Amino acid sequence: MKYKNIFSAALLAMAAFVGFNSCDTDTEAEVIQDLYKYDSQYFENLRAWKQSPHEVTYVYYAAWAPLEGQAGYKDPASWGERIIGLPDSLDIVNLWMGIPTPATHPVAYQDMVYCQKEKGTRFVFHGDASHFNHTFYDRVWDEATQSFKYVTDAKGDTVVIKTDPEKEYTLRSYARWACDTVMKCGLDGVDFDYEGWDNNSMAIVANECDKFFGPNGPWPEKLFIIDWFGGAPDGCDDYCDYFVRQAYTWQIGFQTGTGGRPQEKTIYCDSFGGEAGEAGPRGAQICDYARWEPATGHKGGCGAYYVDTNYKDPSGIPYGEFRKAIQIMNPAVHK
């Protein structure tokens, strides 16, 4: 009797196990949400707004590119690693890790071009104003063709230039190289990383770039930006569209100094990087910078370093805190 009961119990347990397993094999429809599709009027309004006077948003963005030292290009499934996944209302993107081109980074390049044409987002490359001895081909402006042309020596070889703070011509040639790079790569401007140059060298480069990107140059719509930490360069105010106060690391305290630069041209940044700990994904102090205004006038805008960290915002909304900062500075108009 005892064995019979054990056997019966075993049969019941087996039946239950089979029953549970049969339930697991039933297919359940998985709901996949499609991306929201906007009409042409939405994008037209977005582009028009970005061309209007307003406090801008700015990011340093590197997630589009492979890690430093790795070859090839990325074709990521996550929109957190796609340029096209950045917020529509974002104004300016500083391209960390290089410049995407059709040959080197086709996915990122297509995303960039789409964002430029449809969303009116502007992309600048990262120019170095921290070191000297850069080497590049010398070039000059050709009025006849309205383009740059390489300088050649008596043998017909292209002249190579190296930046030297004691030689003004090398700095002006470096500025022409930067402007030519912007035009050849289809970018919207250059952002010089000012972390070691002297004021005079930066002013020379700014003055030369202004010949091409300034109001009287052939491409006045292009941006000339300087980002700085510790001290902002003198002598560039008339040439510069924006001065970006850097934040490679999370800032302790609330930094609102301009370094003596015009308030309305100053963009205040914070870091969403790993050193910010839990504050990084939450957006650090970006909303505080969005809310803050000087006693008179207005700021140029606010921005973020390592904005890709905020893609996984605790709210579940990609770039949730950064989007909130955009709305604080420039509330959407609902009609």
Please provide the spans of the model-predicted regions.
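Low-complexity, compositionally biased segments
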Residues: 8, 24-27, 196, 291, ...
